[in-house]
C-alpha cells in the first residue's frame, strides 16, 4: 500500500475517496523514566533510546493506518500527518491520520 504525506500519488489518479483513517500509539508510564536511565545512550548529541521509542510509536501508527485503510479497500493513504504529544507527566502519544483512497 502506498502511504504518502502528499495529497496525491504522482502518475496515478484518485478514483474514490474512502474516508479519513487514523491511529494512535501511547508509550506507557515508564517511558520517561526509561529515557532518563538511558541518557548515557547520547551519541553525537542524539538520544538513541528516545529516538527508538519515537520510531516505535510512529511505525505502530503507520501499521494501524495501513490496516484500517486496507479494511476500507484502499490502495493508498494520502495526506498523512504524524504528530507527537506529551500526555500528562509520563506518557507520549503518537498519532497519524490521512485519507484512504482507491487509485486508478
Curated annotation (Swiss-Prot):
InterPro entries: UPF0145_dom_sf, UPF0145_YbjQ-like
Gene3D superfamilies attached to this UniProt entry: Hypothetical protein apc22750. Chain B (3.30.110.70)
Any matching Pfam family: YbjQ_1
Family: Belongs to the UPF0145 family.
Identification of the protein by name: UPF0145 protein STH1265
Species of origin: Symbiobacterium thermophilum (strain DSM 24528 / JCM 14929 / IAM 14863 / T)
